[in-house]
Amino acid sequence: MADQLTEEQIAEFKEAFSLFDKDGDGTITTKELGTVMRSLGQNPTEAELQDMINEVDADGNGTIDFPEFLTMMARKMKDTDSEEEIREAFRVFDKDGNGYISAAELRHVMTNLGEKLTDEEVDEMIREADIDGDGQVNYEEFVQMMTAK
């Protein structure tokens, strides 16, 4: 299944994987998964984290390695993001709930994920998604960005 991913997608997933893999040992533990999910405003229980890991832990060693992570991402993409997942993601970014993602809100979430971005990089990300040019990202623009192939 992971063989249907483009090189660009694999590179993006590698970057995402390293955000989860806090200690850089090449595997994601339940603790690391929990840290990232909490930084995104989720509050999973230990059991939920274990279930999430077990779902993709092909070799049964209790952690997720990069090939397992790729399989999980490929699977998720095949079920292409349901509207509800996209709306949920939008809410994570839209901290003040005004229906727009500002540069400050984007920077806040990315920083929580451990991504240190310059102001230019954040502005560039907003510009790429900002179709109507108002300097922020509304829900429609967010959907376009998330579903762009």
Swiss-Prot record:
Phosphothreonine, modified sites: 45, 111
First-listed, main subcellular location of the protein, grouped into a coarse class: cytoplasm
A GO MF term: adenylate cyclase activator activity
Record-listed Phosphotyrosine modification sites: 100, 139
Note from the entry: This protein has four functional calcium-binding sites.
Cross-link Glycyl lysine isopeptide (Lys-Gly) (interchain with G-Cter in ubiquitin): residue positions: 22
Binding partners and assembly: Homotetramer. Interacts with MYO1C, MYO5A and RRAD. Interacts with MYO10. Interacts with CEP97, CCP110, TTN/titin and SRY. Interacts with USP6; the interaction is calcium dependent. Interacts with CDK5RAP2. Interacts with SCN5A. Interacts with RYR1. Interacts with FCHO1. Interacts with MIP in a 1:2 stoichiometry; the interaction with the cytoplasmic domains from two MIP subunits promotes MIP water channel closure. Interacts with ORAI1; this may play a role in the regulation of ORAI1-mediated calcium transport. Interacts with IQCF1. Interacts with SYT7.
Name of the featured protein: Calmodulin-1
Residue numbers bearing the N-acetylalanine modification: 2
Key word Membrane present: no
Subcellular location per the Swiss-Prot or TrEMBL entry: Cytoplasm, Cytoskeleton, Spindle; Cytoplasm, Cytoskeleton, Spindle pole; Cytoplasm, Cytoskeleton, Microtubule organizing center, Centrosome; Cell projection, Cilium, Flagellum
UniProt disease annotation: Ventricular tachycardia, catecholaminergic polymorphic, 4: An arrhythmogenic disorder characterized by stress-induced, bidirectional ventricular tachycardia that may degenerate into cardiac arrest and cause sudden death. Patients present with recurrent syncope, seizures, or sudden death after physical activity or emotional stress. CPVT4 inheritance is autosomal dominant.
Crosslink (Glycyl lysine isopeptide (Lys-Gly) (interchain with G-Cter in SUMO2)) position: 22
Modifications made to the protein after synthesis: Ubiquitination results in a strongly decreased activity.
Annotated GO biological process: autophagosome membrane docking; calcineurin-mediated signaling; cellular response to interferon-beta; cellular response to type II interferon; detection of calcium ion; G protein-coupled receptor signaling pathway; G2/M transition of mitotic cell cycle; long-term synaptic potentiation
Positions bound to Ca(2+) 2: 57, 59, 61, 63, 68
Effect of residue 90 to L: In LQT14; significantly decreased of KCNN2 calcium-activated potassium channel activity; not changed KCNN2 expression; not changed KCNN2 location at membrane; decreased thermal stability in presence of calcium ions; decreased interaction with RYR2
Gene that produces this protein: CALM1
Keywords recorded for this protein, A-Z: Acetylation, Calcium, Cell projection, Cilium, Cytoplasm, Cytoskeleton, Disease variant, Flagellum, Host-virus interaction, Isopeptide bond, Long QT syndrome, Metal-binding, Methylation, Phosphoprotein, Repeat, Ubl conjugation
Positions that bind Ca(2+) 3: 94, 96, 98, 100, 105
Membrane spanning stretches: none
Domain of life: Eukaryota
Modified residues (N6-acetyllysine): 22, 95
Domain EF-hand: 8-43, 44-79, 81-116, 117-149
N6,N6,N6-trimethyllysine modified-residue sites: 116
